[in-house]
């Protein structure tokens, strides 16, 4: 049961955000209230959602519970953010393809907390829109079961075992000042299905440079970038590329 984990985290002064960021079927969404109620009563800090029906249900039944909208919603613009805000969205995790300039404009015109991906895998498709894993092996990314077939080698022409679909990992630790200037409220670091040592190590590096806002040393950058599948800056990959959308 996850409830003791919630209590322990709060004892240590750590907030807990519960992920419900998949598309829900009819029978599942009918059970959502009963599923969330024990967490809500224990002081859950926020819930992360993808399904619009779940968003409305949570807003109606738990009006004082903070709702964060997942990158699986593929939120890319001002009107989407304004719509989500009407249904209780407090924070929006922007699609990884959104530029820093676009995030800044959204923040200034919508007044909603912006969360941005800064470290981890980049999707070959678009956030929340990829059906590759679902079509290839029946494991849908929109159900939290992506098998990451894009990481596998494929044949391209006369070339065998080429990783043509496997993107470099994002590493945005050198772009913290730009993210701050864009109005980004929170940073998202990939941790799901990762070992605890990886997650704690990456978070520790980001925490250090967020607190100091000093220029990242070459040694630290090499260390943190080496934890993933090579690297790209946020400014060189998703957050500044006009062709990603």
What is the predicted function of each stretch?
Residues 1-3, 232, 236-245:
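Short, small-residue-biased leader/transition segments that mark boundaries at the very start
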Residues 4-22, 26-40, 49, 53, ...:
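Surface-exposed amphipathic alpha-helical tracts and adjacent flexible/coil segments at the periphery
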Residues 74:
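Beta/alpha (TIM)-barrel catalytic core signal, keyed to glycine-rich beta->alpha loops juxtaposed to Asp/Glu
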Residues 78-79:
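Conserved nucleotide-cofactor-binding alpha/beta core module
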């Amino acid at each position: 049961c996850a409830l003791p984990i919630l209590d322990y985290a709060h004892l240590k002064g750590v907030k807990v955000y519960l992920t419900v960021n998949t598309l829900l079927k009819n029978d599942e969404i009918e059970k959502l209230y009963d599923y969330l109620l024990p967490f809500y009563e224990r002081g859950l800090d926020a819930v992360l959602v993808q399904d619009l029906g779940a968003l409305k249900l949570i807003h109606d039944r738990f009006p004082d519970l903070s709702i964060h909208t997942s990158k699986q919603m593929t939120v890319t613009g001002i009107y989407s953010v304004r719509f989500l805000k009407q249904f209780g969205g407090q924070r929006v995790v922007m699609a990884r393809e959104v530029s820093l300039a676009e995030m800044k404009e959204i923040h200034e015109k919508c007044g909603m907390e912006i969360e941005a991906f800064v470290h981890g895998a980049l999707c070959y498709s678009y956030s929340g829109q990829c059906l590759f894993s679902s079509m290839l092996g029946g494991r849908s990314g929109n159900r939290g079961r992506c098998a990451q077939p894009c990481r596998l080698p494929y044949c391209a022409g006369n070339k065998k075992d080429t990783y043509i679909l496997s993107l470099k990992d994002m590493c945005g630790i050198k772009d913290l000042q730009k993210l701050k200037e864009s109005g980004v409220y929170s940073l998202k670091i990939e941790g799901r299905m990762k070992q605890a040592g990886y997650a704690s190590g990456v978070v520790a590096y980001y925490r250090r440079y967020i607190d100091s806002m000093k220029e990242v040393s070459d040694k630290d950058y090499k260390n943190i970038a080496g934890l993933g599948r090579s690297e790209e800056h946020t400014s060189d990959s998703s957050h500044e590329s006009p062709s990603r959308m």
